[in-house]
Curated annotation (Swiss-Prot):
Function: Putative control of replication message.
Domain of life of the organism encoding this protein: Bacteria
Keywords (A to Z) from UniProt: DNA replication, Plasmid
GO biological process, one term: DNA replication
Protein name: Protein cop
């Protein structure tokens, strides 16, 4: 499991635990026990909005990270280059960043061990 899946799983568990807490105890940390069940569900809706905000922030982080898959053929060698950058950075310098990965493969020579 990736970190994002674990994070979403924990958020959903928090969401369900708040729901069960409001149903069973008819209150939560904000309201007292003497208040009605509908008031408790109003507070639950506030928590729901807060959790949705967290999920939206998490999805923004997912969109902000991208991975570029690039293939090239150099001296009959298929090179696979994977580079990950953060969204705000290196947008106009993508080729410069990827060229630094390609430098070792430009003058590739075979490294076969000669047989005796």
């Amino acid at each position: 499991m990736t970190f994002n899946k674990i994070f979403k799983y924990l958020i959903s568990l928090l969401f369900l635990s708040i729901l069960f807490h409001t149903i069973i105890h008819k209150n939560n940390l904000v309201f007292s026990k003497t208040m009605h069940k509908k008031v408790a569900f109003f507070s639950f809706s506030i928590f729901f909005v807060w959790i949705r905000h967290l999920k939206r922030y998490n999805s923004m982080l997912e969109k902000a990270t991208f991975f570029v898959l690039q293939t090239s053929y150099t001296n009959e060698l298929k090179g696979l280059y994977i580079a990950g950058n953060s969204y705000p950075y290196y947008q106009d310098k993508k080729k410069l960043v990827f060229n630094s990965f390609q430098k070792p493969f430009k003058n590739h020579q075979s490294t076969k061990i000669p047989r005796e």
